C-alpha cells in the first residue's frame, strides 16, 4: 500500500476524538479486544495510573502484534468505538511509532488531536461561537490570556504553557512507555532509566533558567509529603469529559488515595535512599545487587519512575508515577465529588503546573544524592589528548549576544473538534523564539593526525537571583545541553562551525495534519521526539542576561558505541530521546561532564585545555 494511503488511514483514526462514538455490537468486535473498555469513555486517562496504563499496554501490544497494517487499522477502528479516548490515542500512538510497516507514517500531533489540552477554555469557547456565527468561512481567534500579575508564575506562562514543550513531554512518554517490555516487543530502549532522569533534569534546569530570566528566585523543591502546596488553575476543560481540569486552591496537602497512601510514598523514598547510601539495591529475589558506576543511574531511573524494568517494584514502589496521581487528585482524593483530576495526571498538560517542576526537582535531588557518591572527574578525565580549545564565539547579529522575542503561530482546532463545517478554525498564539546563530569553535589538534572528536555544548546562568557569581557546583545542575555532535579535526588549527538548527536536542515544529493530508507524510524519518527548536535557549532579559557557554571536546574513539550505525533512524534529537531501536549513541554518561559533583570553587580549577567557557548574553526584545 502506498505511504500516502497509509498516512490518510492513520489520520482518520484520530479525527474528532472529542466527539461521541457509536459503539459496535459485541459480535462485530474482534475477540482480542473483548476484555478492554475497563476505563470508561469520558474519563481522563493517565499513563501515571497503574490500572489505566495496564489497559493501554494490553491494547498497544495487540496492535503491535497484528499481522499487517490493514489489521492494525481494523483493530484500532473497532477499539475506538468503546475504548477510553485518551487511552486509545496513547496506545495506538505507541503501536504505530514502533511497527516496521509504519515507517514514514506520522502520528498526528497531540495538540491537533486534543487541542483542549493546550488551548484555554475561554479561547475554545470563543472559537465555537465564531464558527457558529460564520459557518461558511475560515475562522481565526487569538488566544485569551487567563492569568494576571497577582500570580508571579504568570511571568512564566510562555514557558509552562508552550504548545511545543508540552507536546514534547507527551511524545517522550510515547517513545518511552513505562511498561515497555523489550522481550515482548523485540526492541531495545537502551539506558531508558537514565534518559528518564536526564530529560526531566534538563526540563527543571530550563525552568530555573527561565525563572532567573524573569527576575525570580530559583524554585524551592518539593521536600515532604505533608507540605502545603501552592494553588494553580489551568483554565483547561476536557471536551472528552465535559469537565474542567481541577483547580487547586492554595494550602492543600496530599492525601491518601484508595489506590495508595502517603505512608507508602514515605517508605518508597526511604528505601530508595537506603539503596543509594548502602550502594546496593534489593532485587526481586531478595539479593543485594551493587549499584555500579556504569549502570547505577539507569537502575535508579527504572526504580524511581517506576518502569517495567524496575528491579523490585513490590519493594521500591512507584514514587514518580503515584506522585503525579496524588498531585492531580489532592482536591478530591476519594472522588466523592466526581471531579476531573488536575493537569498533573497527563503528560501533555502537567508542564503547565508549577508543582511539576518542584516535584521533579525533588525526584532529581534523589538522583543527585547518588551522583554525590560517585568519584569526581580528574583533569585527565576531562582532557582530550592533543586537543586544545582555543576560543569559542557565538555568531549572531551581535557577536556573543543572542536576541529572543515572541513570535506568532497558529494551531488548527477543526481536526480535534467537530465544528459542524469543513472550514478551518485556528487559534493564533505567541511563543518564544530566537534569532539564528552559529557556534564558531577554534581548536588546535596536535595529535599528529586527523582526529575524530565529540563536541559538547552547554549553557548556564552566570549569576544567581541576588546577583552573586554561581560557583561551578551550584551552576552544574542549572546547565542546559544545547548540542552534541561528531567533528573531524585536521592536524593543526581548525575552526568548527555549527548551526543551532542542527542541535541534537531539538526538533522542528510538528507537521500539521493539513500538510500530512496533502503530501501523504514527510520525506525521510520524522520521529517528533525532542525539545522544540524555538525553545532551545532561555528568554533572557531586556538588559541582556549573562550566561556562560561551555564547550568540551572528547575523544570520539572513546565515545563511540558498538552497534550504533551512522545511519540510525530518529537521531534528530538523540540527547533527550536516544536513537530508535539502537543503543544510546554515546558511551559517556548523559550530561557529561556535569553528571558528577565539581570540587573546584572556581572555574579555573575545573577547566582543562580541552574545555572552554565563554561569556554570552541573551537579550529579550519586544520587537522581532
Curated annotation (Swiss-Prot):
Q: Which domain of life is it from?
A: Eukaryota
Which residues does the annotation flag as glycosylated? 445
A Pfam family that the UniProt record links to this protein: Hemocyanin_C
UniProt-annotated binding residues for Cu cation 1: 169, 173, 200
Chain positions recorded as Cu cation 2 binding sites:
320, 324, 360
A molecular-function term among this protein's GO annotations: oxygen carrier activity
What is one GO cellular-component annotation here? extracellular region
Please classify the protein's predominant subcellular localization into one broad category.
secreted
Expression across tissues? Hemolymph.
Q: Where in the cell is it found?
A: Secreted, Extracellular space
Question: What are the UniProt keywords, alphabetically?
Answer: Copper, Disulfide bond, Glycoprotein, Metal-binding, Oxygen transport, Secreted, Transport
Q: Which InterPro entries match?
A: Di-copper_centre_dom_sf, Hemocyanin/hexamerin, Hemocyanin/hexamerin_mid_dom, Hemocyanin_C, Hemocyanin_C_sf, Hemocyanin_N, Hemocyanin_N_sf, Ig_E-set
List all disulphide bridges recorded for this chain.
529-577
Protein function: Hemocyanins are copper-containing oxygen carriers occurring freely dissolved in the hemolymph of many mollusks and arthropods.
Q: How does it assemble?
A: Tarantula hemocyanin is a 24-chain polymer with seven different chains identified.
Family that this chain belongs to: Belongs to the tyrosinase family. Hemocyanin subfamily.
Remaining remarks: The two copper ions bound each have 3 nitrogen ligands (presumably contributed by His residues) and share a bridging ligand (possibly contributed by a Tyr residue) in addition to binding oxygen.
Protein name, as recorded: Hemocyanin E chain
Organism (species): Aphonopelma sp.
